[in-house]
Amino acid sequence: AIAAVITFLILFTIFGNALVILAVLTSRSLRAPQNLFLVSLAAADILVATLIIPFSLANELLGYWYFRHTWCEVYLALDVLFCTSSIVHLCAISLDRYWSVSRALEYNSKRTPRRIKGIILTVWLIAAFISLPPLIYKGDKGKKPGGRPQCKLNEEAWYILSSSIGSFFAPCLIMILVYLRIYLIAKRRNRQGPHGKQAPGDGDTGPSALGGTSTISKLPPSILPAVGEANGHSKPPGEREGGEQMGDPTSPSTPPNQSSVGPEDGSQKQEEEEEEEEEEEEECGPPAPPTSSSLQGTPNFQPSQGSQVLATLRGQVLLARGPASLGLQPWRRRTQMNREKRFTFVLAVVIGVFVLCWFPFFFSYSLGAICPQHCKVPHGLF
């Protein structure tokens, strides 16, 4: 039963990691430099599944080392190399994510394939450095009283502790601290509004949070009439600069001194103005409704909540009620909370699975070096 389960895990590991490598190398959307970490990590896991696990399974089932003495030395070194490389890869990925979050502009410009390959090379060198002692110190490959050969790692306390710290405990501590820092940064930025300002409802009691309007830039009176068009509503023809109304506000947009023009002349004038408005819209984009105090009295005027700038042929006017000045929106708060929960769950899974898989082995392995007589873990549990 154990052999069947382990064999299935070997095949599943090879197949899954091969798909990861194939996806990154063939998909254009996955060819980002940071995905090279995944390729190298998948390669390390495939090597563990093909060169380490089968021989470990045979050694456990038979109870002795069936293969040659030379392969035992190579096997021990490769075991430490591939497992350490896999763990340190996870640590490097966490650091890469932290730098991309905390130093987005600076680090993303430096995140080149050459730089990522250099980090990957460093990871493999660290793993190789930790795996050298099994080749130098041959370990215990003697024979049991029954005369059967054994293949074990060096059981000296200094190597057990140093390899455990370098292969697991130090990378694990770095990962936990880094992902905790990433979570705090993401949580803070998620609760901030646009342009780095505090989101509505997080203590902001200014005019923007209460739905107030911002100040419109002061422009000459000759420019302000150019922003009279908003959502199909034109400025009343008889309105003066001071806000005084002249004539019927619902009449066509014509100057006061031409109020006596005949229907044909008036319609021709209106068509010319409409053509001029269309030309302005084509050059400057669709106009947004202004919120100037001089336009608040316009009949049927409903200010929009999205526009910030209205550009015309005669000038440019800053408009109020941008996205940062919206009132409290419950749906936005719910979205933020759901995003934080989802991000927390992902981090918990990543760290939890990593610790669950590796901590029992390294804890029991280190415990045998600290107190070999009184804290020895039973062989079956180990």
Swiss-Prot record:
Gene3D superfamilies on file: Rhodopsin 7-helix transmembrane proteins
Pfam family, any one: 7tm_1
Record's GO cellular component terms: cell surface; plasma membrane
MF GO annotations: alpha2-adrenergic receptor activity; epinephrine binding
Comp. bias intervals (Acidic residues): 271-284
InterPro entries per the UniProt record, alphabetical: ADR_fam, ADRA2B_rcpt, GPCR_Rhodpsn, GPCR_Rhodpsn_7TM
SMART domains the UniProt entry points to: 7TM_GPCR_Srsx
GO term, biological process aspect, one: regulation of smooth muscle contraction
Skewed-composition ranges (Polar residues): 291-305
Extracellular side: 63-72, 141-156, 371-379
Cysteine pairs bridged by disulfides in the record: 72-151
Transmembrane segments: 1-25, 37-62, 73-95, 118-140, 157-180, 347-370, 380-382
Cell location: Cell membrane
Domain of life: Eukaryota
The keyword Disulfide bond is assigned to this record: yes
Recorded topology in the membrane: Multi-pass membrane protein
Cytoplasmic side: 26-36, 96-117, 181-346
Ranges for region Disordered: 192-305
Keywords on record: Cell membrane, Disulfide bond, G-protein coupled receptor, Membrane, Receptor, Transducer, Transmembrane, Transmembrane helix
Main function: Alpha-2 adrenergic receptors mediate the catecholamine-induced inhibition of adenylate cyclase through the action of G proteins.
Listed PANTHER family: ADRENERGIC RECEPTOR-RELATED G-PROTEIN COUPLED RECEPTOR, ALPHA-2B ADRENERGIC RECEPTOR
Similarity-based family: Belongs to the G-protein coupled receptor 1 family. Adrenergic receptor subfamily. ADRA2B sub-subfamily.
Subunit-level organization: Interacts with RAB26. Interacts with PPP1R9B. Interacts with GGA1, GGA2 and GGA3.
Entry protein name: Alpha-2B adrenergic receptor
The species this protein was found in: Didelphis virginiana (North American opossum)
